[in-house]
Amino acid sequence: MQVDKSTLIQYRMKRSSETLDEAKLAAENDRLLLAANRIYYSAFYAVSALGIKNDFITTKHGQLLGWFNQNFVKSELVEKRFGEFYRNAFQMRQRSDYDDFVEFDKESIDEKFKLASEFIDKISKLL
């Protein structure tokens, strides 16, 4: 099924918003590993929407992260803190999904959730 770029961007941003809502619910229910996963994916969907807008499409998470840092963080289109957040969220998701005996504290997850919300707002403005 072929869809136009605008529709796909809107869809990815909708996924981003829904995934952030899932992160909030997970955190409220002390499912902190799940919250970490959903925080990362909320950012990932937003950056993938930005990639689509800029004709950069990849299925590789690391490539998307590198592209974002090169084109938006280093060029100062977004604040460095957002690049750090996205990288940290990626690492946090990796740890929560693949490592054993990983734990996150509620404060850390709440802080990342707040940053994710700000990050998604910033990405929306770039679209």
Where do the PLM segments sit?
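Terminal alpha-helical segments
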Residues: 1-127
